[in-house]
Design a protein with these regions (language model features):
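S-adenosylmethionine
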Residues: 1-187
Length: 187
């Protein structure tokens, strides 16, 4: 896996939602180390807690992002950070074809602003030498490659090296479309 998670690491899933990726991370960690699942919505974290219990994942801590203090307390603490950022969802149109009719330019503009803020803020959780994956289920370059390029040009982003990225297109793979970029924090 791109994030290269191992047992004993400190890992943060910043946009955990109902926790599919969190549970995968817990499995890779073999219940060893600290895995923090964060989300804006308490209801999603409650779902994740139930799923984690059913799956035997016991190394997960749950944190609601209700203030900036939640993020600040974690600054430079994690070996690995996953940012599965909010996005337009244009990579999953195959499963949700009506979504394209609901998307407005204002929504795309707003989501790009949210992505920039999330990347700027949550990247500070990565400790020097640690790695971050920025991911979306979008196929728009403005939400993906361009977003990463913009971040790397910021003061915070200058502390990171771009390692590699990957773009999956539904038309080529048969899977949902998505994007992932691997960044490493400079020591």
């Amino acid at each position: 896996p791109l994030l290269d998670v191992k047992p004993g690491m400190g890992v943060v899933d910043t946009c955990a939602g109902a926790g599919g990726k969190t549970l995968h991370l817990a499995s890779l960690m073999e219940n060893k180390g600290q895995l923090i699942a964060m989300d804006l919505y308490e209801s999603k974290l409650k779902q994740l807690k139930l799923r984690a219990k059913r799956n035997g994942a016991f190394n997960i801590e749950y944190r609601i992002i209700d203030t900036t203090k939640v993020i600040k307390k974690l600054h430079e603490k994690a070996d690995r950070v996953l940012i599965d950022a909010p996005c337009s969802g244009l990579g999953v149109l195959k499963r949700n074809p009506d979504a394209k009719w609901k998307l407005q330019p204002e929504f795309i503009d707003n989501i790009r602003k949210v992505q920039a803020e999330v990347l700027e803020s949550y990247s500070k959780i990565v400790k020097p030498g640690g790695k971050l994956v920025y991911a979306t289920c979008s196929i728009l370059p403005s939400e993906n490659q361009k977003q990463v390029e913009r971040f790397l040009a910021t003061d915070t982003g200058k502390n990171f090296n771009f390692i590699k990225d990957s773009k999956i297109l539904a038309s080529e793979s048969g899977f949902d479309g998505f994007y992932m970029a691997l960044l490493e924090r400079k020591i």
